[in-house]
């Protein structure tokens, strides 16, 4: 009977995922055929978080200057509105993940993120470009301070709730998740593979920072999948190569960009090491059944002969382990109150 129920549940979840994929495909077609004609009227992250350079004619009393100032003001206001909506959704997700019934809304969060932040907004705003603008400002570039809010605000939110942004709100992570089809690619699920992918992420972050220091410009936007995958008019062929590689690998690997490249996920993961940060861990109820390990697609949970351990740097707070554990052996803690397992 239990086996039958598991099969029914698996078929049900599979049908839900197919429904979401159909919805996303419809929006993809709509984005190409209809929204593509109006994309110029929508502020994309390439414009909103671009490097801001003051015009040499700044201060002139011409009508054109006044119009440009008004346009810039509207763009900034529009960008801040969307950033605040994203931050609110992230806080909401941080609360929802604590409750079993509300965790079921995660798929709705992800689909909404892809539709609004992806197909409607063209990948705007982009957290990576917000992160880059911090460095550009420190390097003396003239940057709109409003573009810094996105990344900086994610730091305290992650401290309070963990990486819920990655697991519930990020539109690129959501897209990879819905593309993912199979977990049979076992070679990339080992502890050694996880360590190698983390090292690759560190090198990617260092490369990004070095590029910013040497060039004082945002060259990464030419290959940034956060925006490129949702902006079909982008001319950068190298970027499209990486996007194609990401889409193909997402079929076999769970969130490959998140696991190997994304600097935002890496930095937000480091927040879990700060004393007082919200973390997940196993408690005394753990019977080493390995269910949570099997449920964890991001491979944040490791298992030995004694009990399971959770690596909060990798955990995206999807809640699958919390829902799957029948012994309530996984709980929320604070870094200062309990050592992470």
Predicted region positions:
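Bacterial N-terminal signal peptides
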Residues: 23-31
């Amino acid at each position: 009977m239990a086996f039958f129920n598991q099969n029914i549940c698996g078929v049900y979840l599979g049908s839900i995922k197919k429904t979401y994929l159909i919805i996303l495909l419809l929006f993809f077609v709509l984005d190409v055929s209809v929204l593509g004609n109006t994309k110029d009227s929508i502020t994309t992250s390439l414009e909103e978080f671009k490097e801001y350079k003051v015009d040499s004619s700044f201060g002139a009393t011409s009508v054109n200057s006044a119009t440009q100032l008004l346009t810039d003001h509207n763009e900034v206001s529009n960008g801040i509105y969307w950033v605040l909506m994203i931050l609110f959704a992230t806080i909401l997700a941080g609360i929802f993940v604590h409750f079993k019934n509300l965790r079921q809304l995660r798929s709705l969060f992800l689909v909404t993120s892809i539709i609004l932040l992806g197909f409607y907004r063209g990948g705007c705003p982009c957290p990576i470009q917000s992160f880059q603008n911090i460095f550009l400002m420190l390097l003396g570039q003239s940057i709109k301070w409003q573009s810094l809010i996105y990344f900086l605000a994610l730091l305290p939110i992650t401290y309070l709730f963990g990486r819920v942004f990655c697991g519930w709100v990020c539109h690129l992570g959501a897209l990879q998740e819905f593309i993912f089809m199979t977990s049979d690619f076992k070679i990339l699920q080992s502890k050694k593979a996880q360590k190698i992918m983390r090292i690759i992420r560190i090198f990617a972050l260092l490369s990004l920072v070095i590029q910013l220091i040497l060039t004082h410009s945002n060259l990464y936007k030419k290959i940034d999948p956060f925006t490129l995958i949702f902006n079909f008019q982008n001319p950068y062929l190298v970027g499209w190569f990486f996007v194609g590689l990401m889409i193909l690998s997402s079929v076999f690997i769970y969130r490959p960009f998140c696991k190997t490249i994304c600097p935002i996920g890496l930095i937000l993961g480091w927040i879990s090491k700060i004393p007082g940060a919200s973390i997940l861990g196993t408690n005394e109820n753990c019977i080493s059944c390995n269910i949570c390990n099997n449920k964890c697609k991001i491979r944040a949970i490791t298992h030995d002969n004694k009990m399971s351990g959770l690596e909060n740097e990798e955990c995206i707070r999807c809640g699958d382990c919390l829902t799957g554990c029948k012994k309530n052996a996984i709980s929320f803690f604070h870094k200062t109150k309990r050592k992470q397992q």
